[in-house]
Amino acid sequence: MTGRGIPGAVAVHHVAYTVPDLDQAVEFFTEVIGAELAYTLVQDAAGDWMTRKLDVDATATARIAMLRLGPVTNLELFEYAAPDQRRQLPRNSDWGGHHLAIHVADVDAAAEYLRAQPGVRVLGDPETITDGPIAGDRWVYFATPWGMQLELINLPAGAPFEQQTEVRLYQPEGSWSDHRGAS
C-alpha cells in the first residue's frame, strides 16, 4: 500500500444526522438556516438489508432528506422508526456526540437572529478566543428546537496554527446565496 488515506477519495460528500421529526428538521434547516432541499425518500427494505447495510434493527424504516448547505456541504437527515431506538440525544461530551459548525460573517448578528427564532436556544454569548492555535476565532453554540447542537463560527484566515503547518482549513467565500444551484 502506498500513501495514506482512502484510494480515490476526492471530497466529503455529506454529513448525516438522525432527527426525531424529519419534517420539523427540514423546515428548520431550510427556513431558519437557509439550506436547500435536494430530495426526500423512504427506506423500507425487506429482509435483513437495514441490519447488513446500516447496522440497525432489521425491521427499522427510515425517512430521509438530503439538503445542500452553502457551496460545499450536503446534509443528510434521517428519521428512523425502530423497535430498539434510543430517543436521547448525545451530549457533546458523550461518545458519538457531535455538532455542526456554520461559518458566518458576523457571529453576533447571526446569534441575535437565532435568538428570535421560535424554539432555538443560543448557549450564552459569542466569545472570541484570544490565544492559542485559533486565536481570533469568534464562536457560540446553539440548539435546534429538538435539541441538536450547532455552532456559529468565524475563524479568520491567518490563524496562528497556520505558522506551524502547511494545512489550511476551508475558508468560505461569499454568502450561501451566491452559490444557489452551483454544483
UniProtKB/Swiss-Prot annotation:
Changing H99G: Lack of activity. PANTHER family: BLR8189 PROTEIN, METHYLMALONYL-COA EPIMERASE. One of its GO terms (molecular function) is methylmalonyl-CoA epimerase activity. Residues 11-155 form the VOC domain. Changing E76G: Lack of activity. Pathway: Antibiotic biosynthesis. Keywords: Antibiotic biosynthesis, Isomerase, Metal-binding. It is an enzyme of class 5 (isomerase). Disulfide bonds: none annotated. This is 2-epi-5-epi-valiolone epimerase. GO terms for biological process: antibiotic biosynthetic process; L-methylmalonyl-CoA metabolic process. It comes from the Bacteria.
